[in-house]
């Protein structure tokens, strides 16, 4: 992207799905959580701002309680999605779900004027593919701790390096604040079914 190989960003698409195997813990935590937009999609909002190099101009969020109706009691959904129009006219789509049968699935796609990048379109936990009379099988990550293990270590190392060297961390406080604003506006859009500006 930095070399311009895919051209200007047209669309960023983010998927974040928790595995069904952890749904009991997710449901136990849900009443005191921030909900899908604040606890889960906020990471995609960080990515969208970074990958488009722009701020959100308008957004609309929707979703529902497709499998776990109790999310309605918490003004939330078990599956939510949304569309965003960025200030530079790029578009963004995000989806967050709580019950992926195949495991933890986090995927990003960036569509540009001259090409497309897909990151983790199949959430495999190894480079091994099993080919048999049943077809091709690739094992998927079954939990987010395993999926994000290396990222967590890198994050801690980066933080420690910033403290040790006095270097300012990026992304910074403003980035976190912006993503939080987006999350709250998405929640409001979800509850009111209205397209909103970021304000």
Regions found by a protein language model. Give the residues of each.
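C-terminal helix-rich "cap/oligomerization" subdomain common to oxidoreductases
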Residues: 87, 161-199
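C-terminal "lid/loop" region of Rossmann-like NAD(P)-dependent oxidoreductases
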Residues: 138-147
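Short coil/turn segments
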Residues: 15-17, 122-124, 147-151
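Contiguous beta-strand/loop segments that form the cofactor/metal-binding neighborhood of enzyme cores
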Residues: 45-125, 153-167
């Amino acid at each position: 992207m930095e070399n311009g190989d895919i051209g200007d960003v047209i669309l960023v698409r983010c998927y974040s799905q928790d595995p069904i195997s952890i749904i009991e813990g997710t449901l136990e935590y849900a009443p005191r959580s921030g909900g899908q937009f604040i606890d889960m999609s906020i990471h995609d909002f960080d990515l969208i701002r970074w990958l488009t190099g722009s701020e959100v101009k308008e957004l609309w969020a929707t979703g529902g309680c497709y499998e776990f109706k109790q999310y309605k009691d918490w003004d939330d959904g078990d599956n939510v999605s949304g569309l965003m129009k960025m200030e530079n006219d790029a578009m963004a789509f995000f989806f967050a779900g709580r019950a992926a049968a195949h495991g933890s699935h986090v995927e990003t796609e960036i569509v540009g004027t001259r090409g497309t990048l897909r990151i983790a379109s199949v959430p495999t936990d190894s480079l091994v593919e099993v080919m048999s009379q049943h077809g091709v099988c690739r094992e998927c990550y079954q939990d987010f701790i395993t999926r994000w293990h290396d990222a967590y270590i890198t994050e801690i190392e980066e933080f420690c390096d910033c403290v040790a060297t006095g270097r300012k961390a990026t992304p910074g406080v403003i980035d976190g604040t912006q993503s939080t604003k987006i999350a709250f506006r998405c929640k409001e859009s979800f509850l009111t079914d209205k397209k909103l500006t970021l304000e």
